[in-house]
């Protein structure tokens, strides 16, 4: 995803001399190398000074520049939170804060690098838009969308190596709108970010059981497409939410609220990171598994829930 972001921002910079990147001690090697080489005056590495990075970006944007603040997600969202709130959101300054390695992408680096609450924190800020694309193609589209906003935005990216999932999407990318990546009947999965690949793996396993599954990308977490989610809750008999975020303040909580408000009668199952600090050591997939977010764990819970419903019906 970071390479897709770098390619897109480079193209934007070729077309618009007002595009700047400010990074906090992120190596320009690989993804950012071309941008830095061709536009050295528009690539600023401020060092380990994330609060100053946000303040600087706010001032640059007030002078008419189109600024992207880029660093590892925990250091993009948590360390400079006061500056994001007061310098950007309070004054409604159009700066895009880019958090790379959202969720537990930087798995083995430990808790300081696990962004498991960032969606909740950024979504709580007035004027802030929040996007979390699921693959490189959505990353390109989300980056372009951020460049057009006249408000602050938080763009949560994965790291690298994410598969292409949206090449055959049923609907185009549109800021603030959910979209179908595939259509089926009966069951619908809502997801976002790199863990979307798990949604496809779960759907594939369900379809071996002669089930057709819809998958919807909730790439924009704020403003949330409440209408699109409400429609899914009313259309399908079973709705599943899969996310790489704490169960507190993420997509699952909001879907549950919409389901309650809409009096939806579907079976709703949610799968999130547990509400605790992560002490598991291993890869991103290892941590997913430890939190019940592997393909087999999710499929087992779905199957168990269905058996439980059938049993309750048999004794009622």
Describe the role of every protein-language-model region.
Residues 1-156, 161, 172, 311-316, ...:
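Thiamine diphosphate
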């Amino acid at each position: 995803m970071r390479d897709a972001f770098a390619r897109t921002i480079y193209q934007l910079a070729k077309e618009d001399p007002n595009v700047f990147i400010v990074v906090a001690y992120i190596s320009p090697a690989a993804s950012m190398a071309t941008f830095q080489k061709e536009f050295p005056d528009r690539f600023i590495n401020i060092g380990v000074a994330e609060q100053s990075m946000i303040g600087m970006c706010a001032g640059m944007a007030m002078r008419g520049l189109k600024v992207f603040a880029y660093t590892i997600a925990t250091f993009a969202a948590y360390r400079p939170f006061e500056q994001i709130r007061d310098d950007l959101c309070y004054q409604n300054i159009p700066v895009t804060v880019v958090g790379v390695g959202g969720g537990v992408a930087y798995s083995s680096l430990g808790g300081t690098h696990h962004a498991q609450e960032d969606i909740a924190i950024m979504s709580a800020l007035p004027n802030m838009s929040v996007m979390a694309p699921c693959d490189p193609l959505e990353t390109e589209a989300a980056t372009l969308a951020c460049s057009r906003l006249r408000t602050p935005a938080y763009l949560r990216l994965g790291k690298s190596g994410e598969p292409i999932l949206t090449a055959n999407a049923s609907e185009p990318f549109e800021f603030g709108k959910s979209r179908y990546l595939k259509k089926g009947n009966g069951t619908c999965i809502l997801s976002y970010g790199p863990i979307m690949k798990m949604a496809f793996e779960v759907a594939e396993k369900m379809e071996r059981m002669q089930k057709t599954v819809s998958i919807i990308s909730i790439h924009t977490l704020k403003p949330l497409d409440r209408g699109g989610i409400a429609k899914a809750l009313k259309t399908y008999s079973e709705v599943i939410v899969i996310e790489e975020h704490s169960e507190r303040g993420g997509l699952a909580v909001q879907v549950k609220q919409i389901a309650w408000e809409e009096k939806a009668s579907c079976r709703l199952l949610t799968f999130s990171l547990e509400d605790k600090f992560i002490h598991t050591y291993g890869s991103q997939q290892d941590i997913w598994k430890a939190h019940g977010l592997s393909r087999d764990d999710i499929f087992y819970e779905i199957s168990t829930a269905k058996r439980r419903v059938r049993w309750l019906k048999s004794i009622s």
